[in-house]
Amino acid sequence: MNKPVLVSFLVSGDPNPDATLKFMKTLDKYSGVIELGIPFSDPVADGPTIQAADVRSLSNNFKIAKSFEVLKEFRKESDTPVILMTYYNPVYKRGIENFVIQAKEAGANGLIIVDLPLQEATEYRKICKKHEMGTVFLAAPNTPEERLKISDEASTEFLYLISTFGITGARDTFEQMTFDFIKRARTTCKGKICVGFGISKGSHAESLIEQGADGVIVGSAFVDIIKNYGDSKEALVKLEELAKELSEGIDKGYEKRK
């Protein structure tokens, strides 16, 4: 991940596993990383859009094993890095090491466990290191300097910067606080920093990359398209159009930094 990238998020199994695979292949053209969310019944960090996607997936009796199967199929055609996003409860119930091994075998490059605080992640980090599984931790605008450094060191793939306070979901604009946070993280962190929560258009990507981010993470905007168009050719067209717009915004922001 040298040039800034688009990190595209999808909920696995929304609206069905075959559609997820098609969506991944479509977004792959413009994405430097794909973040695949494993649906969970209580996704506390996610806004209404992604919560609804989780419900759609789980209502079809979608299981974690199916996420691994989808990823295995994707791996037959692409080596684009894939980060699996989930919550601690499903990982704990499966057994941390068992989960990490299965994710690795499926072709995952890294994991985000949204509700696992860094201070409680010692065992998890050891297991990930043992099996060469990447880790991504999150930081918010009010994260203290020392905590930011530790989170950066613990994140082998990139540090996930939460652009604002609250839950995920598309928004119109970003506050100066977000730009200041990126600049602070850019100064403090040695690893890659990617910004998520609320990004839905090319102009957003452009402004965030211009401030120094290594990538933008887009989820709700893609999931909204899937909600509206389902498993259809039109959904694929709309997803590709948005991914292209975001990718072009990233390129513009990067040019402004040079």
From Swiss-Prot:
It is an enzyme of class 4 (lyase). InterPro entries: Aldolase_TIM (IPR013785), RibuloseP-bd_barrel (IPR011060), Trp_synthase_alpha_AS (IPR018204), Trp_synthase_suA (IPR002028). The active site is at 35 (proton acceptor), 46 (proton acceptor). Its EC number is 4.2.1.20. Pathway: Amino-acid biosynthesis; L-tryptophan biosynthesis; L-tryptophan from chorismate: step 5/5. It holds the Pfam family Trp_syntA. The keyword Cell membrane does not apply. GO terms for molecular function: tryptophan synthase activity. It catalyses: (1S,2R)-1-C-(indol-3-yl)glycerol 3-phosphate + L-serine = D-glyceraldehyde 3-phosphate + L-tryptophan + H2O. One of its GO terms (cellular component) is cytosol. Keywords: Amino-acid biosynthesis, Aromatic amino acid biosynthesis, Lyase, Tryptophan biosynthesis. PROSITE patterns: TRP_SYNTHASE_ALPHA. The alpha subunit is responsible for the aldol cleavage of indoleglycerol phosphate to indole and glyceraldehyde 3-phosphate. Tetramer of two alpha and two beta chains. Belongs to the TrpA family. This is Tryptophan synthase alpha chain. It comes from Methanococcus maripaludis (strain DSM 14266 / JCM 13030 / NBRC 101832 / S2 / LL). The lineage of its organism: Archaea, Methanobacteriati, Methanobacteriota, Methanomada group, Methanococci.
